[in-house]
């Protein structure tokens, strides 16, 4: 069996010999806390272990505190374009954040997010897509990325 590091997201352990956790994402406006809590409770009833919400502005980030109080699942904040949203999400109780370092404004901003996450013990999922990778890197690594993404066949 391949070794993997255990990461704690709320009270759910990922990796190592732990069971596979089911994660889903809401499609409500996160600042609409009543609708978001209702949908998360439905996801929990369907067997979801972790839930992710979009944090598009500071009102979404501020809503995380109320949402956390109304649910029993670990809460992941999906951050786009602004490092301040990541910091606010962590400070409002996110159990994990998902960022794309290519679109939150440079190394200094990424460092600020990392420092905040470390101070609060919050893990970060790094999600990068080709739209946020500088063209010179994309062209240099395109072939190897295609090779990596191809499934291995026996």
Describe the function of each predicted region:
Residues 144-154:
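Residue-level detector of conserved catalytic or cofactor/ligand-binding positions
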Residues 19-35, 54, 73-81, 137-145:
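Active-site mouth loops of central-metabolism enzymes
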Residues 27, 32-33, 44-66, 101-106:
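Glycine-rich, proline-tolerant flexible connector loops at the mouths of alpha/beta enzymes
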Residues 1-24, 118:
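N-terminal amphipathic alpha-helix/helix-capping segment at the start of soluble metabolic enzymes
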Residues 84-125:
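Hydrophobic or amphipathic alpha-helical targeting/insertion segments
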Residues 58-77, 113-124:
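Alpha-helix-loop-beta-strand connector modules within alpha/beta enzyme cores
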Residues 25-27, 54-58, 80-84, 100-104, ...:
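Active-site beta-loop-alpha junctions enriched in small/polar residues
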Residues 19-23, 50-52, 74-76, 96-98, ...:
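Structural preference for beta-strand elements that scaffold enzyme active sites
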């Amino acid at each position: 069996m391949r070794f993997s590091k255990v990461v704690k997201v709320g009270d759910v352990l990922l990796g190592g010999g732990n069971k596979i956790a089911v994660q889903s994402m809401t499609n409500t406006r996160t600042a609409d806390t009543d609708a978001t809590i209702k949908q998360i409770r439905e996801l929990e009833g369907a067997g979801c272990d972790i839930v992710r919400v979009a944090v598009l502005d500071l009102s979404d980030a501020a809503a995380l505190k109320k949402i956390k109080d109304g649910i029993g699942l670990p809460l992941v904040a999906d951050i786009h374009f602004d490092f301040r949203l990541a910091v606010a999400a962590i400070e409002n109780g996110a159990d994990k954040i998902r960022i794309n370092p290519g679109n939150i404004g440079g190394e200094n901003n990424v460092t600020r997010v990392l420092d905040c996450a470390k101070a609060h013990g919050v893990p970060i999922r790094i999600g990068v897509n080709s739209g946020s990778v500088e063209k010179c890197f994309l062209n240099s690594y395109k072939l190897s990325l295609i090779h990596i993404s191809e499934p291995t066949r026996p």
